[in-house]
Amino acid sequence: MSQSTSVFRRNGFTFKQFFVAHDRCAMKVGTDGILLGAWAPVAGVKRCLDIGAGSGLLALMLAQRTDDSVMIDAVELESEAAAQAQENINQSPWAERINVHTADILQWITQQTVRFDLVISNPPYYQQGVECATPQREQARYTTTLDHPSLLTCAAECITEEGFFCVVLPEQIGNGFTELALSMGWHLRLRTDVAENEARLPHRVLLAFSPQAGECFSDRLVIRGPDQNYSEAYTALTQAFYLFM
């Protein structure tokens, strides 16, 4: 697939090294996922787990950022999304390194014996409320099929002692998620609050937890500068992926 033909495809998102089709996925490629995939710490990792893989975006970003020896498991409950993730991965340079599993993570995790150095998730965060257009979108948006305590428990069952569990959430929900994680024995090690520009309050938060205690590093990321162009910090974080950066 050449860049000249793929850049104009309307059913997905073209990155520098791969294309993500998402027309059969409830949740499309967006800034949240791109932020998380570019931000999650990958130094020294040997095995990664993507919980709720959707289109396969995070798994593909991690594959681009890591050595050829790193293996990635991507677990997705919804069959159409999992099938599209598999197609996206098959067309990428890293098909041999990413395994897609169509499964409920709560059941899948009980069958695993390996431990992961990095567990990553762009999780649902809405409580049950206004109906979505499709059951698939409701599943992707609401915590009914995977609530936050269950997500934290799943990650705890399969992570290495020095590993990181990374999520992206709305700011206020992220604060509650952090309190819950700490009460369950996790340690917050990295936190980046994300604002659209300097004048606005943070609207998203990137969080990295570990079973191992240690210093917590916190910072703030502004997506756009005063001229409305991408900020230097956001560009530095994501330029390996965005096509025209």
Swiss-Prot record:
Pfam families: MTS
Catalytic activity: adenosine(37) in tRNA1(Val) + S-adenosyl-L-methionine = N(6)-methyladenosine(37) in tRNA1(Val) + S-adenosyl-L-homocysteine + H(+)
Location in the cell: Cytoplasm
GO cellular component, as recorded: cytoplasm
Keyword Transferase: yes
GO molecular function, one term: nucleic acid binding
Origin superkingdom: Bacteria
This protein's UniProt keywords: Cytoplasm, Methyltransferase, S-adenosyl-L-methionine, Transferase, tRNA processing
Coiled coil ranges: none
EC number: 2.1.1.223
InterPro entries attached to this UniProt entry: DNA_methylase_N6_adenine_CS (IPR002052), SAM-dependent_MTases_sf (IPR029063), Small_mtfrase_dom (IPR007848), tRNA_Adenine-N(6)_MTase (IPR050210), tRNA_adenine-N6_MeTrfase (IPR022882)
Role: Specifically methylates the adenine in position 37 of tRNA(1)(Val) (anticodon cmo5UAC).
PANTHER family: TRNA1(VAL) (ADENINE(37)-N6)-METHYLTRANSFERASE
NCBIfam families assigned: tRm6a37MtseTrmN
Name of this protein: tRNA1(Val) (adenine(37)-N6)-methyltransferase
Organism listed in the record: Escherichia coli O81 (strain ED1a)
